[in-house]
Amino acid sequence: MSKKIVTIIDVKNYVGQEVTIGAWVANKSGKGKIAFLQLRDGSAFFQGVAFKPNFIEKFGEEEGLAKFDTIKKLSQETSVYVTGVVKEDERSKFGYELDITDIEIIGESNDYPITPKEHGTDFLMDNRHLWLRSRKQVAMMQIRNAIIYATYEFFDKNGFMKFDSPILSGNAAEDSTELFETDYFGTPAYLSQSGQLYLEAGAMALGRVFDFGPVFRAEKSKTRRHLTEFWMMDAEYSYLTHDESLDLQEAYVKALIQGVLDRAPQALETLERDVELLKRYIAEPFKRVSYDEAIDLLQAHENDEDADYEHLEHGDDFGSPHETWISNHFGVPTFVVNYPAAIKAFYMKPVPGNPDRVLCADLLAPEGYGEIIGGSMREEDYDALVAKMNDLGMDTTEYEFYLDLRKYGTVPHGGFGIGIERMVTFVAGTKHIREAIPFPRMLHRIKP
């Protein structure tokens, strides 16, 4: 078979022409003189139709019957070259169909373990390397890819430079209880929790920088929102105000949603995501509310029928139920700003005139997805930062490079970070974060 391979997503450019597709058989059906193949190649899913009389006419009775019989006996995930004529088909969700004229088996797939029937989560996770091939998991990866693409596009357009922070570090970014420790030639080293501290050095050199890579948190959490290894985008910038930072974060999240709408609309359709709701999140301004206003709201509504959360006092941190209620109350992504300094990281800058609160923000996504962005202005004053670290009992000698940034030309600066997997689950409308990354690492799972 002479092969100029065309991807499924591009068949629309070949209507009326004969093409060859390299694909896998996702499913098959039919009876008698007709067979239907559901084909996938990573770019899209596509139906091919084979008619027995056409094969007999083209190849003669013996060879034509043999080829048609081969099609009817194809097993799930067999890899094939399929040749046929592309036709428009209004009945198809894809809009096109392939009138199959020839087929060649590349790799057999006998006893494929993930059949169309229902399987338990543990079984699917044990076979994650194969589960990734299913229609919904392909859609999740397409959405993830669109978000990553939109991230690079957004920051490039806004004057940010990609800056690579190290994954191995000699100190902790925030919580030392959640570190993965390893031996670095006789010296303790840690897998990165965040690239932020190094990114601040980048901002002092380059003005606006962003990092994108894996981070690691040794959290012993089994919730649907936590992974021990995930991908984070951190951005850091000099000379931006807190309000300008919130504007940037809002524009970024809207750009990510728009990027998925533009680049992966079929993935959203596969997952049955409410596209009109996503469009509303783009069209409407995000809500901004202070931490203290949020606490007041929670207290005022804690006896409501839908208030499935525990009582909080001013100074307490939010749990997932509180975040869910707040974002659902406003119906759009909501910034909660100016948290108590006591429950936030040491490097956050106090609110002018109110040292008990810091210039920070968490962006809470509606529909129960909770926090997707955390950010703050950083304390740029050397003496103030050292005093804060001393109050917390921190060893300042471990942060000499970080403190140097305040000694040599310090400037107002800030930044934020977003866990890509949380953004993927939010945009995709799925409930568990394990499906937002190819091979999830969780408390009790490190394989495959």
Swiss-Prot record:
**What Enzyme Commission number(s) apply to this enzyme?**
6.1.1.22
Q: Which segment of the chain is annotated as a signal peptide?
A: none
> What's its catalytic activity?
tRNA(Asn) + L-asparagine + ATP = L-asparaginyl-tRNA(Asn) + AMP + diphosphate + H(+)
Where is this gene product found? Cytoplasm
- Whether Membrane counts among this entry's keywords is no
Q: What does the entry list under GO cellular component? A: cytoplasm
Q: What is its main location?
A: cytoplasm
What the entry lists under SUPFAM superfamilies is as follows: Class II aaRS and biotin synthetases, Nucleic acid-binding proteins
Which InterPro entries did the record assign?
A: Aa-tRNA-synt_II, aa-tRNA-synth_II, aa-tRNA-synth_II/BPL/LPL, Asn-tRNA-ligase, Asp/Asn-tRNA-synth_IIb, NA-bd_OB-fold, NA-bd_OB_tRNA
Q: Name one Pfam family in it.
A: tRNA-synt_2
Q: Does the keyword Protein biosynthesis apply?
A: yes
What Gene Ontology molecular-function terms does this entry list? asparagine-tRNA ligase activity; ATP binding; catalytic activity, acting on a protein; nucleic acid binding; transferase activity
User: What is the enzyme's main class?
Assistant: ligase
Alphabetically sorted, this entry's keywords are: Aminoacyl-tRNA synthetase, ATP-binding, Cytoplasm, Ligase, Nucleotide-binding, Protein biosynthesis
- Known partners and oligomeric status: Homodimer.
- Name the family: Belongs to the class-II aminoacyl-tRNA synthetase family.
> Which NCBIfam families did the record assign?
asnS, PRK03932.1
Q: What is this protein called?
A: Asparagine--tRNA ligase
UniProt gene name:
asnS
